[in-house]
């Protein structure tokens, strides 16, 4: 499964009635494709998946596949902390035309490494779709160790991982010892360039909603050997990347998209909108050099 270098973990637009806004979703898909996204992850944790019903997820997946129209791969977020529910949803999306699925590490129940292995193995055996694992210990409460990831990488349809542990030693071990066709993506925007430097593939990004073309330029410069120019862009983008995570994701990036004129709406409870001070910080971080204008 070739999904490129800059993969955007899409937010889920909501309207004023707190319903999924499918019209705005189509608009967002077109905006992201036009601005540097090589692939889209839909209904993941950036898409507030724990707050979505199964029917909402299915409608979202269908809408994004239709809107993308084969221009970029679409990855459906079907993971949860319920193995059986993840299996059921992974089976359901096979008929929608998605190109793969993403499975987050189970949150709250804190399984052992063997429990994590068996969870992902059971889901992989239930579907023919390519699978991207998603390790995010800061939110799930458990780290998917390198050894466990490498065991999973041997399974036929587990083909990549979004690594958001922030542990470059662990990530380097995975890159060094995984099969040649196993792809490792950064799950942290700010670690995109460092991960590329140790042999990673790219990033599953939140910031690409706002600075996708700039991130794409950074990656392409690095790949062409222009490391100093890539590093300069990295340093330039870093303050905005950090600001987008000053509150629980995706609160700030949704506010930033609204500033760009994209009607993605609010976050669902239990998340809450930015405070006035946080909004001010966000507006200061949206630099005119990115051709972003705050009205």
UniProtKB/Swiss-Prot annotation:
What's in the keyword line of the UniProt record?
Amino-acid biosynthesis, Cytoplasm, Diaminopimelate biosynthesis, Lyase, Lysine biosynthesis, Schiff base
Catalytic activities: L-aspartate 4-semialdehyde + pyruvate = (2S,4S)-4-hydroxy-2,3,4,5-tetrahydrodipicolinate + H2O + H(+)
Principal place of residence: cytoplasm
- A GO molecular function for this record? 4-hydroxy-tetrahydrodipicolinate synthase activity
Any Pfam family from its record, for instance, is DHDPS
* Biological or metabolic pathway of the protein: Amino-acid biosynthesis; L-lysine biosynthesis via DAP pathway; (S)-tetrahydrodipicolinate from L-aspartate: step 3/4
**InterPro entries per UniProt:** Aldolase_TIM, DapA, DapA-like, Schiff_base-form_aldolases_AS, Schiff_base-form_aldolases_CS
Q: Which residues bind pyruvate?
A: 46, 204
Where in the cell is the protein located?
A: Cytoplasm
The answer, when asked if Lyase is one of the entry's keywords, is: yes
- Indicate the family of this protein: Belongs to the DapA family.
List the protein's name: 4-hydroxy-tetrahydrodipicolinate synthase 1
Its lineage opens with: Bacteria, Bacillati, Bacillota, Bacilli, Bacillales
Task: From the UniProt record, report the name of the gene that encodes this protein.
Answer: dapA1
